[in-house]
Amino acid sequence: MPELPEVEVTRRGIDAHLAGRYITQVKIRNYALRWPVSPELITLLPGQRINTITRRAKYLLFACSKGTLIIHLGMSGSLRVLPVSTPSLLHDHFELWLDNEKMLRFRDPRRFGVILWWDGDVRQHPLLQKLGPEPLSDAFNGLFLHEKIQRRSISIKEALMNQHIVVGIGNIYANEALFHAGISPLIAAGSLSTALCARLVDAVKMTLQRAIEAGGSSLRDFTDCDGSPGCFQQQYWVYGRTGQPCRKCGALVSKTRQGQRSSFFCAQCQK
């Protein structure tokens, strides 16, 4: 699933092509995504200007003349900017045609993506209303994290992936950030001191920023808006490296299950 870095890479890529452009046509080839795509978009969106493209958590927010188009990439979604003459393929479900003979095409083989319209204050949308702070913002700091987790018995990795505590951190980047912080993914969140929380926050910010700079991670489906894969997977320290030597101490990387997710860690470096 695309996590915050992949969504931010997508946002930055499409912003240069879409911001300030007018929508001329909408094509929907498959309405059956995670929630049905509204057929009203076919008549509602043409003529509207795309003013800005921002990101909240893993949601892309297209602020248009009369409301906001909300897109979530789901498990396997990607957005491409292409000439309108580009033939569609099997998993190309949705297109925004623009006034420059380009289009934004949404591709999603597994169809867990989301395309929604909201004509009110987008901050009040039910999907966005109760989200935690952005991990790269000043609001996410050691004191904040310590306050949020100090009475929780869940593991620190589960806490990092809780979107009500902090948004956008999925399994890959939780594993990597915990390694860089020297904290085991298995320990109880409530056992962390303020100092450890501050160290973890720094590791989260560093990991996400490096991933964005590397174009995100491309393990299966993800590509940026011009079809290029990310390369952050080449920089993983623990994720997916079960049984391989830790790049820091040489001990073998361990793997365990936490809920429905795999956790990767170095038992020597992470306590």
Curated annotation (Swiss-Prot):
- Taxonomic superkingdom: Bacteria
Zinc finger spans (FPG-type)? 237-271
Give binding positions for DNA. Answer: H91, R110, R152
* Catalytic site: P2 (schiff-base intermediate with dna), E3 (proton donor), K58 (proton donor), R261 (proton donor)
Cofactor mode of binding and number, as noted: Binds 1 zinc ion per subunit.
Q: Does the keyword Membrane apply?
A: no
Cofactor or coenzyme needed: Zn(2+)
Q: Which CDD domains match?
A: EcFpg-like_N
A family per Pfam: zf-FPG_IleRS
GO MF, one example: class I DNA-(apurinic or apyrimidinic site) endonuclease activity
Could you provide one GO biological process annotation from this protein's UniProt record?
A: base-excision repair
Q: Which SMART domains match?
A: Fapy_DNA_glyco, H2TH
Instruction: Describe the reaction catalysed, as an equation.
Output: Hydrolysis of DNA containing ring-opened 7-methylguanine residues, releasing 2,6-diamino-4-hydroxy-5-(N-methyl)formamidopyrimidine; 2'-deoxyribonucleotide-(2'-deoxyribose 5'-phosphate)-2'-deoxyribonucleotide-DNA = a 3'-end 2'-deoxyribonucleotide-(2,3-dehydro-2,3-deoxyribose 5'-phosphate)-DNA + a 5'-end 5'-phospho-2'-deoxyribonucleoside-DNA + H(+)
EC number of the protein:
3.2.2.23, 4.2.99.18
Q: Which UniProt keywords apply?
A: DNA damage, DNA repair, DNA-binding, Glycosidase, Hydrolase, Lyase, Metal-binding, Multifunctional enzyme, Zinc, Zinc-finger
Which PROSITE patterns does this chain map to?
FPG_CAT, ZF_FPG_1, ZF_FPG_2
Query: What InterPro entries does this protein map onto?
Result: DNA_glyclase/AP_lyase_DNA-bd, DNA_glyclase_Znf_dom_DNA_BS, Formamido-pyr_DNA_Glyclase, FPG_cat, MutM-like_N-ter, Ribosomal_uS13-like_H2TH, Znf_DNA_glyclase/AP_lyase, Znf_FPG/IleRS
Q: What does this protein do?
A: Involved in base excision repair of DNA damaged by oxidation or by mutagenic agents. Acts as a DNA glycosylase that recognizes and removes damaged bases. Has a preference for oxidized purines, such as 7,8-dihydro-8-oxoguanine (8-oxoG). Has AP (apurinic/apyrimidinic) lyase activity and introduces nicks in the DNA strand. Cleaves the DNA backbone by beta-delta elimination to generate a single-strand break at the site of the removed base with both 3'- and 5'-phosphates.
Subunit structure, as described in the record: Monomer.
Family, according to the entry, reads as follows: Belongs to the FPG family.
Record's protein name: Formamidopyrimidine-DNA glycosylase
Q: What is the lineage of its organism?
A: Bacteria, Pseudomonadati, Pseudomonadota, Betaproteobacteria, Nitrosomonadales
